[in-house]
């Protein structure tokens, strides 16, 4: 597992959306707002509308998450392996968030937990695509 440094974690925590990309029978990229960096440095995404994403993760487990740009040019891309879970404290957290936002009409089915393996700079400039 690649440890995320403080500046990456800060950006991930402050961005309103992450973009999650997967590949399988079809490539898929979607914005996600139900997200968190876990205490152990993994990335968690609430599975509210992630049907194609979860199909692709079941195929090969490969996930890319990109975040940044809402408050400047700084951005990162995190590549890793995803695992879908349907119970536990993080799932309960996302269910509560979805219930509050959607007034019980939609809920989180589970959570996609991404173990980071590589972090790349996605900021324009000479360090673009450099691995941290």
Language-model features and meaning:
Residues 1-132:
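Binding-site signature for planar aromatic cofactors or substrates
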